[in-house]
Amino acid sequence: MDIVGGQNLRQMWDDLAGVYGDKTALIFESCEGIVRQFSYASLNEEINRTANLFYSLGIRKGDRVALHLDNCPEFIFCWFGLAKIGAIMVPINARLLGEESAWILQNSQVSLLVTSVQFYPMYREIRQDNSTPLNHICLIGEQLPADDGVSHFSQLQARQSATLCYTPALSTDDTAEILFTSGTTSRPKGVVITHYNLRFAGYYSAWQIALRDDDVYMTVMPAFHIDCQCTAAMPAFSAGSTFVLLEKYSARAFWDQVRRYQATVTECIPMMIRTLMVQPAAPTDRQHHLREVMFYLNLSAQEKDAFTERFGVRLLTSYGMTETIVGIIGDRPGDKRRWPSIGRVGFSYEAEIRDDQNRPLPAGEIGEICIKGIPGKTIFKEYYMQPEATAGALEPEGWLHTGDSGYQDEDGYFYFVDRRCNMIKRGGENVSCVELENIISAHPKIQDIVVVGIKDAIRDEAIKAFIVLNEGETLSEAEFFSFCENNMAKFKVPSFMEIRTDLPRNCSGKIIKKNLK
């Protein structure tokens, strides 16, 4: 089923500007509370000016341009401005350091970077390396350096026409983006995303949450991440909704922002839900317009129930990854939630549970979650310049091996068990880290928890728990181990525990376990 109809991103924005005109498309709120607002027509003009800016700097169809930015309107201008001229966006995780960022520039052969003043010292140093392909930096901010090869984004953009001056032929099969995975365990891989992928994501995710043009979709997810792009921005714009982008997440400010912008839909990661739950209860907890909160793994059933009861919202499970573009398994509009199920497979996809020999498994048996889509359309096209990695993950028939363990029931509902690489082998038993984390997170004194496997000469691996306590709480080892022994099988009880003030995370909220082992 082709729901895109051959429409690329340039055509999308021209149509949106014509249909919705003065309707509010984008609202941005900075950490300082400064608000910038754009209608569909004015946002399209900003996108056109930015496209012309890139053209004036020599960027043509197929060229790659990196963005190293925190959430800001300029990210949206650049994303779609590049797409309009057939160039390719390479977003860089704003938390990456010099060596990691330089590796992405080199790997994708980026010659032009758009970044903010705060990140410039790092890139000034990178440019001193003669091997870097980077030869020009376009800076956003004030007090810009007078260095060679550096230009002022706002000044350049203001000089450009609001009418697009370069319109190469575009196909929905053209690459729009190379999005590097988080790389929590190894070097990141560049996920190639097409115009079709992004257009499909808009329609699919809008269907998933029954989005309408009178909805307001608010997010604090980083714009350089697939979740913000494909489950928030693309569906909001595709449906003609208003997209509210916040610069940073604040648990204290979150509900005030929800009320201020009359948000009807938002998305959360578990860390956000947990920090919202530890905020003092208030009479205004249910005074909002939110009808759906899309969330991503992992939360225990107790946490989900407590959140929905306190704030009076519906939690909508969405399971996916960068390679699937969208949440290909999840709750459907109007469905009764069947927790701990992660939902059913969405339209345009197939899903199976397979064993280690790549054979389908019957209901109830745990194996690898495999997804069938169309490369370059409903799932990613390939890993950039990595044919072996592509072949290892993606079968010729379109089956994607997710690397996740799960099972399905007789009714077609899927259940996530763990990342296959996130299983601890303990004395012949496979122990799911997620299962233990969900159990331990129910302890009233514990705010955050992660378990890892550490080498053990006798049992292959021992289990260690890293814990963050709620403010003002104390927890003895005896109390912790007693809780575990009363709530899980003996072979699953951790051997060690360590209390920390925080846990290392990447920009997406994923815990970087390699920093804990």
Swiss-Prot record:
Catalysed reactions, semicolon-separated:
4-(trimethylamino)butanoate + ATP + CoA = 4-(trimethylamino)butanoyl-CoA + AMP + diphosphate; crotonobetaine + ATP + CoA = crotonobetainyl-CoA + AMP + diphosphate; (R)-carnitine + ATP + CoA = (R)-carnitinyl-CoA + AMP + diphosphate
Give the protein's recorded name: Crotonobetaine/carnitine--CoA ligase
Q: Which Gene3D superfamilies match?
A: 3.30.300.30, N-terminal domain of ligase-like
Task: Write out the GO biological process terms.
Answer: carnitine metabolic process; fatty acid metabolic process
Gene this chain is encoded by: caiC
Which InterPro entries does the record match to this protein?
AMP-bd_C, AMP-bd_C_sf, AMP-binding_CS, AMP-dep_synth/lig_dom, ANL_N_sf, CaiC
Pathway stated in the Swiss-Prot or TrEMBL entry: Amine and polyamine metabolism; carnitine metabolism
Which Gene Ontology MF annotations are present?
carnitine-CoA ligase activity; crotonobetaine-CoA ligase activity; medium-chain fatty acid-CoA ligase activity
Q: Which UniProt keywords apply?
A: Ligase
What protein family does this chain belong to?
A: Belongs to the ATP-dependent AMP-binding enzyme family.
Instruction: Please give the CDD domains that the UniProt record associates with this protein.
Output: FACL_DitJ_like (cd05934)
Enzyme class, spelled out: ligase
Q: Describe the function of this protein.
A: Catalyzes the transfer of CoA to carnitine, generating the initial carnitinyl-CoA needed for the CaiB reaction cycle. Also has activity toward crotonobetaine and gamma-butyrobetaine.
EC numbers on record: 6.2.1.48
Annotated organism of origin: Salmonella choleraesuis (strain SC-B67)
